[in-house]
Amino acid sequence: MLENPMTDPKEFFDTYCDFVTKVTSDPSLDIESLKASLEDIQNNSDIDVPRLMTAALGLSSEGGECVEIVKKMFLQGKPANEENIFHMKRELGDIMWYWVTACMALKLDPVEVILENQKKLEARYGKEFTINQSEVRAKGDL
């Protein structure tokens, strides 16, 4: 267990960094382990690894760009005007591009993904959203 960080901040961060390293997977720490993991997935599944990597990184970064606009409008005075809505439209287009890239990497039909999502949400909520159903999930509801 870590001591109070104010006692010795350098020792605290050194200890925490050691902890982080201990609980991190080999592929996250070592390029050769990462290469082996990627090659194993590429060779033993139908997943297109480079395409999925591109999609995952792109979804995260483009989603962050969209969130940044919303944050600035809601919290920092950026106007909710046509220009910023157009900016979000473009970011949403980028998100769609990466989403379809993920579908292709996983050999999934994008329409089937949307239908599966609708089926999942209908099973969870029925006809309308409730806070309880969003918080208390049935077994197997991902």
What would you call each of these model-derived segments?
Residues 1-92, 96-142:
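Flexible "arm" and connector segments at domain edges
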